């Protein structure tokens, strides 16, 4: 029994150390965004703004879960962008359900939370969906001029995926989704 407790204690300490290292390997804008959230949480607590406080706590909880899931991988502003976008989508789905059930009080709360999350989403140094779509559209136009029978897989091969985050200011998943969307509309 004693060895079991010791083993559990050691493994618990090791996992905490891994989380600390993961946070230090993250990008500076990621760290700044998390620090900004914590600062805003403190302000919301002092101002007794329950809606903002609850929303920011939800964001920090989602970030913490993302860090745990990453297990030592670098996290950056694109991971935050994906998380915030996912949370906005969840709230939009909730609004639809609340409207079906005539819960206007909950609809207003969800809409307010969406505005708060969009505020933090706008602070991230990430290209907007419209900017990404414009770059992808230009890329596909150039590729189709040189090769009229362009396939989707060929378009994916032409993107420098290692340089894409810095050049495009977008994550690979955002660029891939835009390529698929644009390719379907141009075909």
UniProtKB/Swiss-Prot annotation:
It is found in: Mitochondrion. Belongs to the AIM41 family. Keywords: Mitochondrion, Transit peptide. This is Altered inheritance of mitochondria protein 41, mitochondrial. One of its GO terms (cellular component) is mitochondrion. InterPro entries: Asn/Gln_tRNA_amidoTrase-B-like, YqeY/Aim41, YqeY/Aim41_N. Residues 1-24 form a transit peptide. It comes from the Eukaryota. GO terms for molecular function: carbon-nitrogen ligase activity, with glutamine as amido-N-donor. The keyword Transmembrane helix does not apply.
């Amino acid at each position: 029994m004693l060895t079991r407790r010791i083993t559990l204690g050691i493994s618990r300490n090791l996992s905490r150390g891994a989380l600390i290292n993961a946070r230090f390997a993250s990008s500076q804008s990621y760290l700044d965004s998390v620090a900004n959230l914590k600062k805003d949480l403190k302000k919301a607590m002092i101002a007794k703004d329950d809606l903002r406080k609850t929303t920011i706590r939800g964001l920090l909880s989602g970030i913490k879960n993302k860090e745990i899931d990453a297990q030592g991988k670098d996290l950056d502003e694109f991971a935050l962008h994906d998380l915030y976008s996912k949370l906005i989508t969840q709230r939009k789905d909730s609004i639809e359900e609340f409207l079906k059930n005539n819960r206007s009080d909950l609809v207003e709360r969800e809409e307010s939370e969406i505005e708060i999350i969009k505020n933090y989403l706008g602070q991230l140094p990430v290209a907007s969906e419209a900017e990404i779509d414009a770059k992808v559209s230009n890329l596909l136009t150039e590729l189709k001029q040189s090769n009229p029978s362009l396939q989707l897989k060929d378009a994916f091969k032409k993107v420098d995926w290692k340089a894409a985050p810095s050049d495009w200011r977008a994550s690979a998943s955002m660029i891939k989704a835009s390529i698929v969307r644009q390719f379907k509309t141009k075909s």
